[in-house]
Amino acid sequence: MNATRRQRLWWVICVLTAAALAVTLIVFALQRNMSYLFTPSQVSAGEAAGYQQFRLGGMVKAGSIQRAGDSLKVSFTVIDKNAATQVEYTGILPDLFRDNQSVIANGRMQGGRFVANEVLAKHDETYMPKELKDAMAEGHAGKPIPATATPLTAPR
């Protein structure tokens, strides 16, 4: 093998190694930022056990909202068709947050309860992530979920 071929081979190996390293770093960064959506039924079945951080979606159970008098700490129960999960959140809740309203909380399980670091309330009558709409369609005791509910991925 002559010197020119050896140098060319060396550059090809370096470029491929750098590309592989870049792809690996991108994949790890994306995995760390992914947040999966689970319903209370899936959480109680243990499907969310392997995830440090995930989203919990469902309806706020009527009468379950309890606010601490001396802080911004709020606890409430998120329900779906078969299960309920207790949620704790410290912070200012969205204006649309109330009983029997669709909610998505981002956080982690801690000691049998979900500790949220972010709470999102349904912003209008047509918004609901498709997977949450499908999971909630059978058990929602309030108003029916419209068939025209906009999926999360649909452009607005």
From Swiss-Prot:
Annotated compartments: Cell inner membrane
Entry superkingdom: Bacteria
GO biological process: cytochrome complex assembly
Region spans: Disordered: 137-156
Periplasmic topological segments: 30-156
Binding positions (heme): 123, 127
Membrane topology qualifier: Single-pass type II membrane protein
Chief location of this protein within or outside the cell: membrane
Residue intervals passing through the bilayer: 9-29
Record keywords, A-Z: Cell inner membrane, Cell membrane, Cytochrome c-type biogenesis, Heme, Iron, Membrane, Metal-binding, Signal-anchor, Transmembrane, Transmembrane helix
Pfam families, sorted: CcmE (PF03100)
GO molecular function: heme binding; metal ion binding
Low complexity: bias regions: 146-156
GO cellular component, one term: plasma membrane
Cytoplasmic compartment spans: 1-8
PANTHER family according to UniProt: CYTOCHROME C-TYPE BIOGENESIS PROTEIN CCME HOMOLOG, MITOCHONDRIAL
Reported function: Heme chaperone required for the biogenesis of c-type cytochromes. Transiently binds heme delivered by CcmC and transfers the heme to apo-cytochromes in a process facilitated by CcmF and CcmH.
Family label: Belongs to the CcmE/CycJ family.
Protein name according to UniProt: Cytochrome c-type biogenesis protein CcmE 1
Species in which this protein is naturally found: Xanthomonas euvesicatoria pv. vesicatoria (strain 85-10)
High-level lineage: Bacteria, Pseudomonadati, Pseudomonadota, Gammaproteobacteria, Lysobacterales
